[in-house]
Amino acid sequence: MESVNWAWGLSLIALTIAIHATGLSFLAFGLRSVRFRLEGQSLGLGHAFAMVIGAMSALGLLLAVLHGIEAAVWAAAYVWLGALNSPQDAILYSVDSIATRGASGLRLERHWRMMGALEAFDGMLLFGISTAFIFAVMQISWPMLVSRRHRNS
């Protein structure tokens, strides 16, 4: 049974990372239009600042949705495999695991626990990728705001 856990867990990690990479690619293209507007227009500092705040807020919300979809993939696997019976329990357990919180009060049976550990590992990877993406967006946005501030002063 342990090899089944590893096979499912690693497959789900690969799937959720593919989902994440796809989602981030779409987000990057969406954010590109914000960047072009910031670079191409002579916006005032206040308007540029509002655009960056709006873009970062939208990015945070869309990343939360993306992480929720990935948790739902794990939850569906738990239900399909019979590791958890209730879809509600499965999604609660999955969100809790993928966030590496581990305090939902739900437990997998002993022979499924490796999957829960692998989901937590997956969550660390996914949240790390998201953090790096947010950092990259800020690395691009911040210099644009600073240069705009210096032009306006």
Language-model features: locations:
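Feature marks short, highly hydrophobic, charge-poor N-terminal signal-anchor/signal peptide-like helices
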Residues: 1-12
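Helix-boundary and loop/linker segments of multi-pass membrane transporters
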Residues: 1-3, 45-53, 105-110
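Pore domain of cation channels
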Residues: 10-20, 89-147
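Alpha-helical transmembrane segments of multipass membrane proteins
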Residues: 16-24, 28, 66, 70, ...
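Membrane-interface helix-loop junction between the first two transmembrane segments
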Residues: 22-44
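Perimembrane loop-to-helix junctions flanking transmembrane segments
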Residues: 37-51, 96-101
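Interfacial helix-start motif at the membrane-water boundary
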Residues: 47-67
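Outer-pore turret/helix-boundary of cation channels
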Residues: 64-93
